[in-house]
Amino acid sequence: MFKFKQVIVVRKDLKLSKGKLAVQVAHGAVTAAFKAYKEKREWFEKWFHEGQKKVVVKVESLDELFKLKAEAEKLNLPTALIQDAGLTEIPPGTITVLAIGPGPSEIIDKVTGHLKLL
């Protein structure tokens, strides 16, 4: 069983293409992992050596994303909000995903455990 994980939360209201969605999720995963590497090195290393578990879940709105970010930050979890450059499908600066962690699974579950998988 994994003791550490990373969760990437996707906005479904944007109706992104599969390719665009995959890229946004990747941006979130890398950005949050880099932040954890700098700020929560022990969590990052344990997550990395366990196999780098990632889970992708969905929300229906930007407001939900902001609420989750605030909850995660209260628990001192690394987070990353991703804004699109706006070169293809959506306007510049559109927030597409929130990545949380890597961090202890039981802490991240307090924030995202109720969300449905993408």
From Swiss-Prot:
It is found in: Cytoplasm. It catalyses: an N-acyl-L-alpha-aminoacyl-tRNA + H2O = an N-acyl-L-amino acid + a tRNA + H(+). Its EC number is 3.1.1.29. One of its GO terms (cellular component) is cytosol. Pfam families: PTH2. GO terms for molecular function: peptidyl-tRNA hydrolase activity. The keyword Hydrolase applies. Transmembrane segments: none annotated. InterPro entries: Pep_tRNA_hydro_II_dom_sf, Pept_tRNA_hydro_arch, PTH2. The keyword Cytoplasm applies. Keywords: Cytoplasm, Hydrolase. GO terms for biological process: translation. SUPFAM superfamilies: Peptidyl-tRNA hydrolase II. Belongs to the PTH2 family. The natural substrate for this enzyme may be peptidyl-tRNAs which drop off the ribosome during protein synthesis. NCBIfam families: arch_pth2 (TIGR00283), PRK04322.1 (NF003314). This is Peptidyl-tRNA hydrolase. It comes from Pyrococcus abyssi (strain GE5 / Orsay).
